[in-house]
């Protein structure tokens, strides 16, 4: 969606929709984006195809959540599509926050289970935290 938002994996800039060899997808992604004065962003990495595109009962699986620009709230869990489940898409969303949000508020959401890895409700998370989608990109991988 935006040329200003990039994700680097294994030293390579990811093109939207690019297929990546599974082994290379295991490196921690490095999101790169412009930050203005007094601007705060959240980055979510999700898999809408868990455990398969035909039966995505864990949609969205949360692989990583970074808040307040570079504070890790949910640590990176590498892609792990089940063998034989075909290509999985791994989306990165750059979300603008209305302001800096105290870590304790985010941690409360984790404690009440509104932020969890399986069945992460991305739309609700965006709405509840008054976030705005600025950009997104994704890659595909399979085993």
From Swiss-Prot:
The keyword Cytoplasm does not apply. Keywords: Lipid-binding, Virion. GO terms for cellular component: virion component. It is found in: Virion. InterPro entries: PEBP, PEBP-like_sf, PEBP_euk. Its main location: virion. CDD domains: PEBP_euk. It holds the Pfam family PBP. GO terms for molecular function: lipid binding. Signal peptide: none annotated. The keyword ATP-binding does not apply. Belongs to the phosphatidylethanolamine-binding protein family. This is Phosphatidylethanolamine-binding protein homolog R644. It comes from Acanthamoeba polyphaga mimivirus.
């Amino acid at each position: 969606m935006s040329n200003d938002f990039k994700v680097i994996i294994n030293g390579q800039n990811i093109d939207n929709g690019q297929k990546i060899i599974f082994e290379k997808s295991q490196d921690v992604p490095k999101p790169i984006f412009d930050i203005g004065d007094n601007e705060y962003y959240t980055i979510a990495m999700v898999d809408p195809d868990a455990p398969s595109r035909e039966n995505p009962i864990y949609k969205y699986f949360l692989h990583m959540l970074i808040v307040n620009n570079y504070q890790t709230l949910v640590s990176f869990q590498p892609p792990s599509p089940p063998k034989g489940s075909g290509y999985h898409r791994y989306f990165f969303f750059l979300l603008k926050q209305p302001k800096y949000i105290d870590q304790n508020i985010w941690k409360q959401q984790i404690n009440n289970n509104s932020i969890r890895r399986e069945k992460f409700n991305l739309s609700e998370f965006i709405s509840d935290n008054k976030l705005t989608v600025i950009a997104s990109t994704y890659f595909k991988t399979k085993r």
